[in-house]
């Protein structure tokens, strides 16, 4: 009896000395294109520096990220996760580990696990990653009418998972409908629902609801009482004759009008181009030497000759610094608190970059922040083919005549303006207006790695040669050609000067 009691007490003592692994206690939510964070910890607190930490997808052998022998083991990862994960080990001595998964896609949705093991013991935790994408505002169109019935079609795209689509009547009642759903090449859902209504239908709405996000987007159309008002055939004949005459004279008038309008538009474009060139020439008088501070660069950004930033696939071994960004960013060694300053940045053929200035006191440890003036950033952003500014709480899109690869940045501290120039055609892209406070530093962000098309981002010298090159590129981009080509140029939107 005493032997049995001793054995039980020994087992209890052994069990009480072990630890458990805890992960997220509810599904992790993430939006397509953003990042997700998975946190695991040991309880009670136990140093995990000498342990193996394995994040896996569904089953143990499907490795998302592996930490072993005191370092990451990237060669063990599944191909779809290589270059997209980062293990945060700041608190690993206390048994707390976090994994960040970047650039979420719909294919990432599913079950994930964290397994922590010592030489004689292991535990794991399982959780679910739920991926969501909020689609476009529904577009309602009238596709026709048959026997005094209107046929409506509602379309919305870019959803995940499939949304709940509904037609609703004037009193909010659900209406029966036919629906069709397709998936695009990225796995997102495109939804179409159709409806047939009669005259006097009133206000009809089409809504798409996202279950995970509890978000709903809606559009409405008003069907008037006289939509189907019958007309006599005599009246129809008269109306048709009037329309034909009006169409004939309208075409003649429009041809005359547009021939005059085209000349005015071209003259306006020439004036704006010359005005932008004059502003650029004035800005270049204030050119300053800008060099990058390697101590501020993210570990995946390699700074060479203090002018060039290259995005590496894997992070470099860099010394710890309070000045270093956790975003894929770098700032200049120079700071400005007064005066006028101009410099140029060559973004190459990269599809994503951010260029501008930031306050010297921005929180560099915060990885997720809106690059807006409210947070101390004044930047021009390129995302794919879209060029825009972030002005909290809204975005401002701009449409340059020539896609810019080289950007000129002009800061006038006292006037509270920062202007961005397209060096390719010497045009002014946009001017932001704000009241600056404190030190400002030139800022570059290089957010994504592209092995095939990625090129370095370079701080360029401001020289007369660059101005001649820009004039040659502008002549190539905007040739003096026939009227038909000039007309197509004249439809390009003018760029506004913006204020916050």
Curated annotation (Swiss-Prot):
Chain positions covered by the region annotation Disordered: 470-500
Keywords from the UniProt entry: Adaptive immunity, Disulfide bond, Glycoprotein, Immunity, Immunoglobulin domain, Membrane, Repeat, Signal, Transmembrane, Transmembrane helix
Single GO MF annotation: signaling receptor binding
UniProt membrane topology term: Single-pass type I membrane protein
Chain ranges of the Ig-like V-type domain: 19-132, 133-222
UniProt GO BP: adaptive immune response; regulation of cytokine production; T cell receptor signaling pathway
Induction (record text): Down-regulated in neutrophils after treatment with LPS and TNF.
Principal cellular location given in the protein's record: membrane
InterPro entries xrefs: B30.2/SPRY, B30.2/SPRY_sf, BTN3A2-like_Ig-C, Butyrophylin_SPRY, ConA-like_dom_sf, Ig-like_dom, Ig-like_dom_sf, Ig-like_fold
Residue ranges annotated for the B30.2/SPRY domain, each copy included: 270-466
Cysteine-cysteine disulfides: 40-114, 154-206
Any one of the GO CC terms: external side of plasma membrane
Family: Belongs to the immunoglobulin superfamily. BTN/MOG family.
Summary of the function given for this chain in its UniProt record: May stimulate primary immune response. Acts on T-cell stimulated sub-optimally through the TCR/CD3 complex stimulating their proliferation and cytokine production.
Protein name as it appears in the record: Butyrophilin-like protein 8
Annotated organism of origin: Homo sapiens (Human)
Upper classification of the organism: Eukaryota, Metazoa, Chordata, Craniata, Vertebrata
């Amino acid at each position: 009896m005493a032997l049995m009691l001793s054995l039980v007490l020994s087992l209890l003592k052994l069990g009480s000395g072990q630890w458990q692994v805890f992960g997220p206690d509810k599904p992790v939510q993430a939006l397509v294109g953003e990042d997700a964070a998975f946190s695991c910890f040991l309880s009670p607190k136990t140093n995990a520096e000498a342990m193996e930490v394995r994040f896996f997808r569904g089953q143990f052998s499907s490795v998302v990220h592996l930490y072993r022998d005191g370092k990451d083991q990237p060669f063990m990862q599944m191909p779809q996760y290589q270059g997209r994960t980062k293990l945060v080990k700041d608190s690993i001595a206390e048994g707390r580990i976090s994994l960040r998964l970047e650039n979420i896609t719909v294919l990432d949705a599913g079950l994930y696990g964290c397994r922590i093991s010592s030489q004689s013991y292991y535990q794991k935790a399982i959780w679910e990653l739920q991926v969501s994408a909020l689609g476009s505002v529904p577009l309602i169109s009238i596709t026709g009418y048959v026997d005094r019935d209107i046929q409506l079609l509602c379309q919305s795209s870019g959803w995940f998972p499939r949304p709940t689509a509904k037609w609703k009547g004037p009193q909010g009642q659900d209406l029966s409908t036919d629906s069709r759903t397709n998936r695009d090449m990225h796995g997102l859902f495109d939804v179409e629902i159709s409806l047939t209504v009669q005259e006097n239908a009133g206000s009809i709405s089409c809504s798409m609801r996202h279950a995970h996000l509890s978000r709903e987007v809606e559009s409405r159309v008003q069907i008037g009482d006289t939509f189907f008002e019958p007309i006599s055939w005599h009246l129809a004949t008269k109306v048709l004759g009037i329309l034909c005459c009006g169409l004939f004279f309208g075409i003649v008038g429009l041809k005359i009008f547009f021939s005059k309008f085209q000349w005015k538009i071209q003259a306006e474009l020439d004036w704006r181009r010359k005005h932008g060139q004059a502003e650029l020439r004035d800005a270049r008088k204030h050119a300053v030497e800008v060099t990058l501070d390697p101590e501020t660069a993210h570990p995946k950004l390699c700074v060479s000759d203090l002018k060039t930033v290259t995005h590496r696939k894997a992070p470099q071994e860099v010394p710890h610094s309070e000045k270093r960004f956790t975003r894929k960013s770098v700032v200049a060694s120079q700071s400005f608190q007064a005066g006028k300053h101009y410099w140029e940045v060559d973004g190459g053929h990269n599809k994503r970059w951010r260029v501008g200035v930031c306050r010297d006191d921005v929180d560099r440890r915060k990885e997720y922040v809106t690059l807006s003036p409210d947070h101390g950033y004044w930047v021009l952003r390129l995302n794919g083919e879209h060029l825009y500014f972030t002005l909290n709480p809204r975005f401002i899109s701009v449409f340059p005549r020539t896609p810019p690869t080289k950007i000129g940045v002009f800061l006038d501290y006292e006037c509270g303006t920062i202007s961005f120039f397209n060096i390719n055609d010497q045009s002014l892209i946009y001017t932001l207006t704000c009241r600056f406070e404190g030190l400002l530093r030139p800022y570059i962000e290089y957010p994504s790695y592209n092995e095939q098309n990625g090129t370095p981002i370079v701080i360029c010298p401001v020289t007369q040669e660059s101005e001649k090159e820009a004039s040659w590129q502008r002549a190539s981009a905007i040739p003096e050609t026939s009227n038909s080509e000039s007309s197509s140029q004249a439809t390009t939107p003018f760029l506004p000067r913006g204020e916050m």
